[in-house]
Amino acid sequence: MATQKEDHTALDLIIKSLKSPTMVCEGTHFDGKIPHTFVIFGASGDLAKKKIYPTLWWLYRDDLLPKPTKFCGYARSMLTVDSIKEQCLPYMKVQPHEQKKYEEFWALNEYVSGRYDGRTGFELLNQQLEIMENKNKANRIFYLALPPSVFEEVTVNIKQICMSVCGWNRVIIEKPFGRDDASSQALSDHLAGLFQEDQLYRIDHYLGKEMVQNLMTIRFGNKILSSTWNRENIASVLITFKEPFGTQGRGGYFDEFGIIRDVMQNHLLQILSLVAMEKPVSCHPDDIRDEKVKVLKSIEALTLDDMVLGQYLGNPQGTNDDARTGYVEDPTVSNDSNTPTYALGVLKINNERWQGVPFILRCGKALNERKAEVRIQYQDVPGDIFEGNTKRNELVIRVQPGEALYFKMMTKSPGITFDIEETELDLTYEHRYKDSYLPDAYERLILDVFCGSQMHFVRSDELREAWRIFTPILHQIEKEHIRPITYQYGSRGPKEADRKCEENNFKYSGSYKWHGGKAATSNH
């Protein structure tokens, strides 16, 4: 079991690697002698308040940022640093003994108010950055926590007015990266006309999660798994994302994109590419992303026959107003909306390793639990001698909540009789690494930007292949006004989804569910 002392030792090693010129490797090093400036566009928004400012504070608190690093917010709202500080406080997780350092962090912050569609605000911003940097050589990071509608104007103004002349410049872009292949390609072409690919960091925060980053180690660092990771041994792969709440007043925003664009086309497909890709030449970011692109190119475009679409209804027995409110009852959603809040899609990979193995992606809102996981289901044991009682082995990678890795297998029940039962080999992080600190996904990713590692960011050709797979079905759903199947708030989703899983070689026995080391009877 890891101790608190060991955890601090690990942190010390990270800090040493970040700052020592003798320990330079891809994505683990920055120049601590050059000033860095981090600019947050959309500083008045929820993402900045709940994620970006807290992440920057945690990195500063743990001495993981180069010194000096300063921060500047930019938005249309007339705000002050003190007002931003007050709005962020509930999300900063400040301990009493950290108060002095917390005040030091905010002393490094500035704020500029301005429009996104004109030069004046950006000229004021650049003047402020030069003052913060004392007009010295400095590296600049620009985080666009903004709606896509202003991306083009903001990036043009950054390029023309705000770029560091002597240092490097990096631009972080939040999804959505377009609505389909055409709009995504238009955005990519626009960005390519302004920046080099190594300056662009398209962020998918799921790529920063502990167990998603662990996928490569699990696959390529264990002979027992790597040798069975193929169609000869694996029956199906189920990648799941479930949320127990609905749109909760954000229906108008969600209705513009839907669950496929919001979760499946990005988060789940990125996980699939890590599960299914071939072994890269090295751990260099481009080698890894090359293999991800190769496997994406092997995937057929989705069709309606491959999918189940759902939309939640209110539950009359719900314990609160949200649970009793259906999706189209949200006042910000049209009464005749066909936008799916649940989707299941079966992807087929046409290559030697995976031919015939269904990759099932499912995601939904207003379901029975919060869960994100990868479930690798192995084939039935040939020549079963246990009267058909043998269940399939499963390797389960739990992304959230409660990071874990466990392997479902058959063993003899303790006792005098010769009965068999399903149990697991369990690596639950909160048990094995009890005192270890697991960074938030944004901490990992923002630190990667400082270090110049693009391993966990989406490259333009990855994006192009992702939209190739999903654009035809998205257009068909919208043009033909495909009606989703209704399901009740708090349920497991449409029953048709379970049937689709069964049709695609996923077997569920219904007798066993993992609870972080405790087994119980439950519905999957």
Curated annotation (Swiss-Prot):
<dbReference type="GO" id="GO:0051156">
    <property type="term" value="P:glucose 6-phosphate metabolic process"/>
</dbReference>
<keyword id="KW-0560">Oxidoreductase</keyword>
<dbReference type="GO" id="GO:0006739">
    <property type="term" value="P:NADP metabolic process"/>
</dbReference>
<dbReference type="GO" id="GO:0009051">
    <property type="term" value="P:pentose-phosphate shunt, oxidative branch"/>
</dbReference>
<feature type="binding site">
    <location>
        <position position="262"/>
    </location>
    <ligand>
        <name>D-glucose 6-phosphate</name>
    </ligand>
</feature>
<dbReference type="InterPro" id="IPR022674">
    <property type="entry name" value="G6P_DH_NAD-bd"/>
</dbReference>
<feature type="binding site">
    <location>
        <begin position="426"/>
        <end position="428"/>
    </location>
    <ligand>
        <name>NADP(+) 2</name>
    </ligand>
</feature>
<dbReference type="Pfam" id="PF02781">
    <property type="entry name" value="G6PD_C"/>
</dbReference>
<feature type="binding site">
    <location>
        <begin position="42"/>
        <end position="49"/>
    </location>
    <ligand>
        <name>NADP(+) 1</name>
    </ligand>
</feature>
<keyword id="KW-0963">Cytoplasm</keyword>
<keyword id="KW-0521">NADP</keyword>
<dbReference type="InterPro" id="IPR001282">
    <property type="entry name" value="G6P_DH"/>
</dbReference>
<feature type="binding site">
    <location>
        <position position="175"/>
    </location>
    <ligand>
        <name>NADP(+) 1</name>
    </ligand>
</feature>
<feature type="modified residue" description="Phosphoserine">
    <location>
        <position position="20"/>
    </location>
</feature>
<feature type="binding site">
    <location>
        <position position="375"/>
    </location>
    <ligand>
        <name>NADP(+) 2</name>
    </ligand>
</feature>
<feature type="binding site">
    <location>
        <position position="175"/>
    </location>
    <ligand>
        <name>D-glucose 6-phosphate</name>
    </ligand>
</feature>
<dbReference type="InterPro" id="IPR022675">
    <property type="entry name" value="G6P_DH_C"/>
</dbReference>
<feature type="binding site">
    <location>
        <position position="508"/>
    </location>
    <ligand>
        <name>NADP(+) 2</name>
    </ligand>
</feature>
<protein>
    <recommendedName>
        <fullName>Glucose-6-phosphate 1-dehydrogenase</fullName>
        <ecNumber>1.1.1.49</ecNumber>
    </recommendedName>
</protein>
<keyword id="KW-0313">Glucose metabolism</keyword>
<feature type="binding site">
    <location>
        <position position="243"/>
    </location>
    <ligand>
        <name>D-glucose 6-phosphate</name>
    </ligand>
</feature>
<feature type="binding site">
    <location>
        <begin position="205"/>
        <end position="209"/>
    </location>
    <ligand>
        <name>D-glucose 6-phosphate</name>
    </ligand>
</feature>
<dbReference type="InterPro" id="IPR019796">
    <property type="entry name" value="G6P_DH_AS"/>
</dbReference>
<feature type="binding site">
    <location>
        <position position="362"/>
    </location>
    <ligand>
        <name>NADP(+) 2</name>
    </ligand>
</feature>
<dbReference type="InterPro" id="IPR036291">
    <property type="entry name" value="NAD(P)-bd_dom_sf"/>
</dbReference>
<feature type="active site" description="Proton acceptor">
    <location>
        <position position="267"/>
    </location>
</feature>
<comment type="function">
    <text>Cytosolic glucose-6-phosphate dehydrogenase that catalyzes the first and rate-limiting step of the oxidative branch within the pentose phosphate pathway/shunt, an alternative route to glycolysis for the dissimilation of carbohydrates and a major source of reducing power and metabolic intermediates for fatty acid and nucleic acid biosynthetic processes.</text>
</comment>
<feature type="binding site">
    <location>
        <position position="514"/>
    </location>
    <ligand>
        <name>NADP(+) 2</name>
    </ligand>
</feature>
<dbReference type="Pfam" id="PF00479">
    <property type="entry name" value="G6PD_N"/>
</dbReference>
<dbReference type="GO" id="GO:0005829">
    <property type="term" value="C:cytosol"/>
</dbReference>
<dbReference type="GO" id="GO:0050661">
    <property type="term" value="F:NADP binding"/>
</dbReference>
<feature type="binding site">
    <location>
        <position position="492"/>
    </location>
    <ligand>
        <name>NADP(+) 2</name>
    </ligand>
</feature>
<comment type="similarity">
    <text>Belongs to the glucose-6-phosphate dehydrogenase family.</text>
</comment>
<feature type="binding site">
    <location>
        <position position="371"/>
    </location>
    <ligand>
        <name>NADP(+) 2</name>
    </ligand>
</feature>
<feature type="binding site">
    <location>
        <position position="365"/>
    </location>
    <ligand>
        <name>D-glucose 6-phosphate</name>
    </ligand>
</feature>
<dbReference type="GO" id="GO:0004345">
    <property type="term" value="F:glucose-6-phosphate dehydrogenase activity"/>
</dbReference>
<comment type="pathway">
    <text>Carbohydrate degradation; pentose phosphate pathway; D-ribulose 5-phosphate from D-glucose 6-phosphate (oxidative stage): step 1/3.</text>
</comment>
<keyword id="KW-0597">Phosphoprotein</keyword>
<feature type="binding site">
    <location>
        <position position="370"/>
    </location>
    <ligand>
        <name>D-glucose 6-phosphate</name>
    </ligand>
</feature>
<feature type="binding site">
    <location>
        <position position="398"/>
    </location>
    <ligand>
        <name>NADP(+) 2</name>
    </ligand>
</feature>
<keyword id="KW-0119">Carbohydrate metabolism</keyword>
<feature type="binding site">
    <location>
        <begin position="406"/>
        <end position="408"/>
    </location>
    <ligand>
        <name>NADP(+) 2</name>
    </ligand>
</feature>
